[in-house]
């Protein structure tokens, strides 16, 4: 009997006892290829000696120092590294313990920025439907995942949502990417004008949409148009790269591929690679200057901000990525993953879309390719795929509610940056078998 309140109360999980490279091992000795990086976290895989050595060394030196009393070498060095590699205009870093905390801090930072510069009437946040920004209340309110939000709506602050930039589901037949980008971005301007530009704090978006919709990249020029609209009305652009950032898409920051810089950016998962809980908010010089010239104080904080062991781990992770040229591997293995997925599923009668960037790929399942009709949500196809994949020693990240929080199924893939061709091929082979087995169980009406 477990004393843990697990995510799923019914059922028994295997006990993980070890990990090495791209594999996790359970107590029965079974190996699982971690093709999802957990939740797009384990960018270096498991048991990397450089990272564990850095953790050990920092623990021997200093395990904890509260940020109201001290800064630390580990935090200062990591901040320098992050800004050195940051998008243009980013000047400072605020450390937290994970993605939801990062989004909460970013929201408060954006609000306080306008208070500091004398625009305290700004109170509205705009985000996108079918987005996910975290499970704490502010982040949950900002996200557009209805399944996650529904029972907690009475507790959520008012936020406003527009449609996502989701070509497979929203681009009209015959509509060019340029026309679709313009139409999708126009929704933001319309919403700003509806609310009143003087009342809007920020627009929040995942650069590449993650778990909720399954690695959905924007069409070309969408974010350039979004950036221009935000600038036109003095609205801050907050990019959430908690899942898609820190190398996952083949560049350190996903927005590099869209040719823009945000005002504020959140990062987490790939920052520490799962070796320690850590996230961060990157902020532009203008945000910092408003605080510095105003109250000189950011009214926010948590006990474990800038935790030295977490910062040391993240610094080691980022050092390995840079030293070993792993972004190049993400690009080349990402191309192979896309090719192999196309080979296996390109003509599959129940795969509607294969999408993503780098080692961040989504496969959307449909009942009918021609109409894009989804499977009955009651069939829980995504859960069946996960079960079949685990049985085959493969960890993937399937989700339901791809379209509206209820309908749709997809599988998210986010393997470690260290994968090679053989591992990529094995991932796709096992996934193909798992998908076919799950579909057969649906057809056979097996529970």
What is each of the regions a protein language model found here?
Residues 1-447:
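Conserved N-terminal phosphate-binding loop of PLP-dependent enzymes in the Aspartate aminotransferase
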